[in-house]
Structures are given as C-alpha cells and as structure tokens.
C-alpha cells in the first residue's frame, strides 16, 4: 500500500533527523535503518532484536502498522476459512473468541487490551484474540443485523464514542482489573452497538453521502 511505504519513509527521516537521548540515532547504523525501513515498507514485522528504537515494536518507524498487519492476517483467514463458515457456527465461535479476548485483557500488569504491537508470544496471542473476535463479530452482525429506523443515529453514536474516549483508563493501578472489564465491555458491547446504530443511518444529505463515500474509498 502506498500509505505504508510513505509512512515508513517519513518515519525513517524523522527518526534520523530527530534523534534524542532516548532514541540515540548515533548508535544505529545506516544499514540497520535502511533494513528496518525496507521491512516496514513491505509490512514485515521486526523481531525484538531488530528494533532500532528500543521498544521492541513490530514496526518501529510506523508504529500503528501493527494493526494493519493483523488486518492482513484477517484478509487471509477470510479468503480461506471465514467466508465458508456458516452463520450457525459463527454464533458459537464469537462467544469463544470473546472469552479469549477477556483472558487477554487480564494478562500483564495493566489489565488492558493494548496487545499486538510487538512480536512476542503475549502480544501475538493478544493481538490475535482482538482480531478474531472483532472480525467474526463483524461478520455475524453483517449477516444477521437488519437496520431499523433509529432517530438521530449520528448523535447517539457520537455521544457514546465521546463518553467512552473520556475514560481511557478506569480504576487506576490499584484497581486495574476494572480497566480490563471496561476494555472488554467497549469491544464486545459498546463498539458493536455504535456500528449497528450507524448502519441504521439512512436519511443523510447528498453532500454528507459524498463525503462518507470519499472517506470509505480513501480507507
């Protein structure tokens, strides 16, 4: 994807010219920087030993690419497996993946679902559960949900998202288990609700429709 390549190149430039005490570019050879940039361009994850920033990231020059990496895995799984899975089977496996997601939320010291950004066992398992639940739940909703008439769906969805993002962490370090419950609730209940509400939005202006279509095509 062009945006992946552009992001990797920009990341390499910014890393090289904005070095600091934490990210000492002087300790990174040009060959290592070039190799990491090339891996990022082709969306090939870096191992812990190959990370040039010291955080152990899959994609140290364009961190958010880890999410796109798991999306590519989803595309492969859909092409070979999930598109053939019946709706009845989805009703069984979605709750199972939700259990796995809950398990992932309570691993580590912080009780959250911020897994998937590093090529470690814990991060890969956590990232896969995030992927498997969200993707299969989306398939199930697309097959079974029939949009109805909901008044002000945009307002409702926006308010829910604003409220959720105002609470990025719940319970603090002492009661971090509360944050695990909150993260699981958001992914398994709140976000699917927002998606269903948004799918019920039909009465939109031509201008809004063109903007939404353009954003969808851009994505």
Segments the model singles out, each with a brief description of its role:
Residues 1-4, 219:
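Structural motif
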Residues 57-82, 131-133:
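Function-critical hydrophobic alpha-helical transmembrane segments in multi-pass membrane proteins
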Residues 5, 9, 13, 76-80, ...:
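Generic alpha-helical transmembrane segments of integral inner-membrane proteins
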Residues 7, 89-109, 157-165:
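Small-polar-interrupted transmembrane alpha-helices in polytopic inner-membrane proteins
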Residues 48-55, 81-85, 114-219:
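Alpha-helical transmembrane segments in multi-pass integral membrane proteins
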Residues 3-70, 100-115, 121, 185-199:
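Membrane-interface helix-loop-helix regions
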């Amino acid at each position: 994807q062009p945006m992946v390549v552009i992001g990797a190149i920009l990341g390499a430039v910014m890393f090289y010219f904005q070095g600091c005490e934490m990210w000492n570019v002087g300790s990174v050879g040009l060959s290592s920087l070039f190799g990491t940039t090339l891996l990022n361009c082709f969306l090939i994850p870096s191992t812990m030993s190959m990370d040039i920033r010291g955080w152990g990231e899959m994609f140290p020059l364009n961190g958010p690419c880890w999410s796109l990496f798991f999306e590519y895995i989803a595309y492969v799984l859909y092409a070979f497996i999930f598109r053939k899975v019946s709706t009845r089977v989805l009703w069984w496996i979605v709750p199972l993946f939700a259990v796995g997601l809950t398990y992932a939320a309570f691993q580590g010291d912080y009780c959250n679902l911020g897994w998937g950004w590093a090529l470690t066992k814990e991060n890969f398992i956590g990232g896969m559960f995030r992927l498997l639940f969200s993707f299969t739940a989306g398939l199930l909703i697309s097959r079974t949900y029939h949009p109805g008439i909901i008044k002000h769906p945009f307002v409702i969805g926006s308010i829910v998202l604003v409220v959720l993002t105002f609470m990025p962490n719940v319970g603090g370090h002492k009661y971090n288990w509360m944050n695990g419950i909150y993260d699981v609730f958001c992914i398994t209940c709140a976000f699917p609700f927002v998606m269903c509400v948004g799918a019920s939005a039909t009465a939109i202006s031509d201008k809004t429709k063109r903007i939404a279509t353009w954003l969808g095509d851009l994505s």
